[in-house]
Amino acid sequence: MRIFKIPLILKNQQFLILWGNQLFMQVGFNLCNYTVLLILADRTHSPFVQAQFFAALTLPAFIFGLIAGPIVDMVSRKSLMLVVDFILGILFLMYAFAGSSLFILIIIAFLSSSAARFLIPSQAATIPLIVGKGILSQANALFLFTLMGSVVLGYIIASPIIELFGGLGTGGERAPFLLSSAFVIIGFVLLAGLKKIKAVMPEVPKGTIFKKTFHLFWQTVGEVTSNQKVSLPILLLIFVELNIGILSVVFLEYVRRYLRLPLTAVSMVLMMPLIFGLISGVAMLSKIQGRFGYRRSIYMAVLGIGLLFFVLGVLPVLGRWDLGIVLIRFFSVIAAFVTGILVVIIAVQGRTILQMNSDIKMQGRIFSFLDVMIAIVTPVPVLLIALTADRISLPGTFVFMGIGTITVVIIGGKMFFGRVIGKPTN
């Protein structure tokens, strides 16, 4: 008798190729990003400077998101993804020769993020075309886990690689960038083996590419604004991205000040628990859905994020006692693990609801629209919160974020979670 049954999604060769490409591309992308953040943190000790780098990564979504989605829906997705892979490989290599110049690093970040704007919706829109509806939720869980997990994995391996080749301030800073370029090559080769994707093309008016592009974009805006089963999942995914952005720019300083650890230690102390939390979240998701349903599980997860922010803000008070630092480190590890579980509950379910309730002809545009909204919503709050943490109080900032999140969830919970989110419709 077979003890372990291989999930059907892992028998889908087309999905495995796309998944493998995503893994190598995302790990390389995040490995570069975290290496730059470490360099900036080492040179400046300023969350505000790090926030400027984060803004350079998010702003291209607003600029290119207007055209990325329509283009994804109108052209060969495989060809488009191969071109983007090639461009990213060159940009990752350029990081290795940029030194510590903030201006050059921001320019490369802007260009790499601009290219990625075409890759992300292409991948997301391709999944429903190569995976049956019966296993679509499995594909989304694995794909989104890789998207989130690659952030953590990139962060985990960045510090040890830098230390292995000499540490910050030495030539070891180049090693992660060179490795990222190698990852892109592997991802490119994998993607080349993907069969031609038969996409359902949208109807477009006659005229220039600009006329077609903006027609399709505004058609998508109409769908999002009129369909709450599309708009609310988008809000949930924006919430996840916003919190990832905030933590990425302020948590390094939190580790340095209150956990009293070197910046390179954050990978093992916090990122490992986070990735185990992501794995646990994926493993438990079906049981959580069965017991609590979509609405209640998402509601509780968002509330949990707010509580974790509040706890992180209060923890530094323990530093006054002899065992305070040990307790802060312990609770921070637990918080990282729980955060991984909560992110999976919100993001995987939000993504599944979004795909199942949006028109297949709009998949590329819907996820591109999500990128645009993330670009509009996240940079200003991240910059303001980073500035507040830098100039006023880092613990106080976490407390404020926690109270704010909890308040919004309690006030708006019945209005949104009770009336909109339900089981996805076919």
Question: Where are these predicted regions, by residue range?
Answer:
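C-terminal transmembrane bundle of multi-pass solute transporters/carriers
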Residues: F53-A56, P60-I67, M74, K78-I90, ...
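Core transmembrane helices of Major Facilitator Superfamily
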Residues: F29, L111-Q123, V338-G350
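Helix-loop junctions on the cytosolic side of multi-pass membrane transporters
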Residues: A125, L129, E173, F177-I209, ...
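Extracellular/periplasmic helix-loop-helix junction of adjacent transmembrane segments
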Residues: L31-A61
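Cytoplasmic helix-loop-helix junction between adjacent transmembrane helices
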Residues: A109-G149
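Helix-loop-helix hairpin linking two adjacent transmembrane segments in secondary transporters
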Residues: F143, L147-A192
